[in-house]
């Protein structure tokens, strides 16, 4: 039905290609009918031989997600940004990757207030860096694809408040820290920094 979601779309058990490497007509027909295709990358549900073949024929997933659990956080899924980075490596433009991990999932579950930076929306924000270099990405079959970018989270805000800041971007330099920094309970600062 329109609006249904087919997840694990690039799993090995789905016959996405015919014997000549062309996309199966049923995939295109289902998309035309309004079925959404989701990645749902877990331990066995993402194979480059499926995904790249579809990409080369213009068939991209509607949403990029994980099926993350304790058995795949060390590979092959690892985390959502690792999965998103695989799509960069396969040639999906950054803007399309970001849309498919933010806005598209929100719309598919009928939550238009999520996945947006509109004025008045909840300020849930991930600040990302696209690090350049050579990076290897694994699929569920133990094969590798090399890419030239890797998405990394440098800060996260939840409802406008910083909740993750591994590079201390929201903190003052220690020399300029406010008064409570400089005292242990029951003491006062008795020295000055010389520059």
Feature-to-residue mapping (PLM):
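Active-site core of metal-dependent hydrolases
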Residues: 1-74
């Amino acid at each position: 039905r329109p609006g249904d979601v087919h997840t694990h779309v690039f799993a090995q058990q789905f016959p996405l290609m015919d014997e000549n490497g062309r996309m199966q007509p049923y995939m295109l027909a289902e998309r035309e009918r309004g079925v959404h295709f989701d990645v749902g990358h877990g331990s066995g549900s993402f194979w480059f031989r499926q995904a790249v073949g579809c990409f080369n024929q213009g068939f991209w997933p509607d949403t990029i997600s994980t099926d993350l659990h304790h058995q795949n956080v060390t590979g092959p899924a690892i985390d959502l940004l690792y999965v998103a980075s695989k799509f960069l490596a396969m040639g999906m433009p950054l803007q399309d990757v970001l849309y498919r991990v933010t806005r598209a999932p929100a719309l598919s579950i009928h939550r238009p207030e999520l996945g947006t930076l509109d004025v008045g929306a909840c300020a849930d924000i991930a600040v990302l860096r696209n690090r350049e270099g050579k990076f290897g990405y694994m699929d569920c079959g133990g094969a590798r694809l090399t890419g030239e970018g890797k998405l990394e989270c440098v800060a996260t805000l939840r409802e406008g408040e910083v909740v993750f800041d591994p590079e201390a971007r929201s903190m003052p330099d220690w020399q300029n820290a406010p008064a409570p920094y400089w005292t242990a309970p029951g003491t006062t600062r008795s020295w000055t920094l010389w520059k």
